[in-house]
Amino acid sequence: MTSVRYVAIGDSFSEGVGDDLPDGRQRGWADLVAQGWANARGSGIQYANLAIRGKLIWPIVEQQLEPALALKPTHLSFNGGGNDMLRPRADIERIADAFTRVLRRCDDEGVTVILLSGANPSPQLPMGRVIQRRGDELSRAVLARAEGRDDIVRALNWPDRVLSSPPFWSPDRLHMNARGHHRVAARVLEALGLPVAGEWWSLPEATVAGPRGWSYYREHVGPWLRRRLTGTSSGDGREAKYAEWTSVAPSGPSAR
């Protein structure tokens, strides 16, 4: 059996923000994929995750891609652009060009790309119509760059209307909760041709209610706007949670 060395790069989506464990750590779909992959093989895999929240797409590529490739992975997952789409201006073609760079460099190194589109938060966000339009445009632009490439593993989350519904999102309405991360992990494992624990597609709904009205703007939108105005990021000073390989051993059929 060939070895699997899987590395994830990206922003909060791939870091796992919103999937909070009791000990304070954040797990996320990429961690779940690593566990599900090891379970399906019945043997361990190597896993690294260089994703850092708050990153725009080109800083992801410029800061994470080469360190990820230096690890000599067999598989690399990539998603980005969500933070770019929240800015006043978003150059869709330039964002999509980042995907071209990742595909080219992975081709150079013989690495299989797992290409993800992000989950769609627009139905519940202020300026949701703008975000929806930009996300649709970005999805088309990225898929055009991957057209005819049967060697790319595609896990397309943006069109998933179930995933866009409130039960899959954290109180900030911008990051998925554990339920959302499990659904994305299920889609990635399915795209890899691996078995998926059926409940991962739709875990029991959490009962935690998020803030509404002005409370939502005060708790979540206000801090985000302050970071934009001060030129800071939620990822400033944060290091990757798995910058080097960590071994993931098989466990039971569910990694919850």
Segments (PLM) and residue ranges:
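Charged, glycine-enriched surface loops/patches
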Residues: 93-116, 149
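Aromatic/hydrophobic pocket-lining residues that form the small-molecule binding cavity
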Residues: 61, 95, 99, 135-139
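Conserved catalytic region of serine esterases and O-acyltransferases that act on ester linkages
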Residues: 150, 172-175, 179-256
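Short glycine-enriched, charge-decorated loop/helix-capping segments at active-site entrances
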Residues: 19-24, 90-93, 128-132, 170-171
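Serine-esterase "nucleophile elbow" of acetyl-processing enzymes
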Residues: 1-53, 65-72
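Oxyanion-hole/transition-state-stabilizing segment in secreted/luminal serine hydrolases
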Residues: 15-19, 43, 57-94, 120-121
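Substrate-gating cap/lid alpha-helix
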Residues: 123-158, 178-182
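Active-site segments of SGNH/GDSL-like serine hydrolases
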Residues: 79, 83, 105-136, 157-165
